[in-house]
């Protein structure tokens, strides 16, 4: 199978790439390396099997459509995104440029390249504030994002559905909880487990702000990669929450 993975040099994307090449897929990674690293691609099975091509490119650049289409993928996994909620509030235009325009570049490439399916990475941020009585959260819960980031991730799922209706492009959206695991950036705002692990290894105390009673759903990156593979291999679409519960 021929697969495109945008954001494939990131910690989630590179884990997915390892799984894809492990089963024999030919993979094109599109990543601008602004937060990912090509070292993530040489650290796993990608370097062993030699079936990965890296295209260093901003996903929102107009060339993305041509690059995706010319690869003639069977499937596209779209993980490239601006993921910092604070940055989305400070610069919502750039957030939309990457998360909305970037998605449209990829969708057009998938359509023109006759891809069978796109798997889109969304987020629990599409639901906004959730009362604990609603947990574990079901996919039919009200979607009321409270940040530009959450808005773009909800818009992305809607665009994917529209491309299915207009062009017959298969699509599945995965709304991820807080992902943790190897290759995670210990400096990111969502990387609390990586941050704690780094501090513990350095024999330093871990700081918890607020009441200490906050709850978050964390999911291991390997389980997320498995969810992507299952979403790609199955015909049904729609939106699925991916978490531990």
Regions found by a protein language model. Name each.
Residues 6, 179-183, 208-218, 240-245:
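Glycine-rich Rossmann NAD(P)(H)-binding loop
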Residues 1-179, 232:
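N-terminal Rossmann-like NAD(P)+-binding domain of SDR-like oxidoreductases, especially those catalyzing
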Residues 133-135, 186-194:
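A glycine/serine/threonine-rich, flexible loop-to-helix segment
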Residues 80, 110, 188, 200-201:
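Hydrophobic aliphatic residues
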Residues 194-206, 216-241:
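Alpha-helical substrate-binding/gating segment
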Residues 90, 98-101, 140, 147, ...:
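Residue-level signal for the nucleotide or nucleotide-sugar donor/cofactor binding architecture
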Residues 65, 184-185:
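A short local structural element in Rossmann-fold oxidoreductases
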């Amino acid at each position: 199978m021929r697969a495109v993975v945008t954001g494939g040099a990131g910690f989630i994307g590179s884990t997915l790439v390892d799984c894809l090449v492990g089963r024999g897929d030919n993979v094109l990674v599109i990543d601008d390396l602004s937060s990912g690293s090509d070292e993530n691609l040489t650290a796993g099975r990608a370097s062993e099997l030699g079936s990965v091509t890296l295209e260093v490119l901003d996903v929102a650049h107009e060339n993305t459509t041509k690059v995706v289409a010319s690869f003639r993928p069977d499937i596209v996994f779209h993980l490239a995104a601006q993921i910092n909620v604070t940055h989305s509030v400070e610069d919502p235009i750039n957030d939309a440029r990457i998360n909305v325009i970037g998605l449209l570049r990829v969708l057009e490439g998938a359509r023109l390249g006759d891809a069978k399916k796109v798997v889109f990475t969304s987020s629990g941020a599409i639901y906004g504030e959730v009362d604990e009585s609603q947990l574990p959260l079901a996919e039919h819960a009200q979607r009321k994002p409270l940040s530009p980031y959450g808005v773009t991730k909800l818009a992305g799922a809607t665009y994917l559905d529209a491309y299915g209706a207009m062009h017959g492009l298969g699509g599945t959206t995965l709304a991820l909880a807080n992902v943790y695991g190897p290759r995670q950036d210990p400096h990111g705002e969502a990387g609390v487990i990586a941050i704690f692990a780094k501090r513990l290894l350095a024999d330093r105390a871990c700081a918890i702000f607020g009441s200490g009673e906050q709850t978050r759903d964390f999911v291991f990156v390997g389980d997320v990669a498995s969810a992507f593979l299952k979403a790609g291999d199955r015909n049904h679409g729609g939106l699925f929450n991916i978490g531990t519960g």
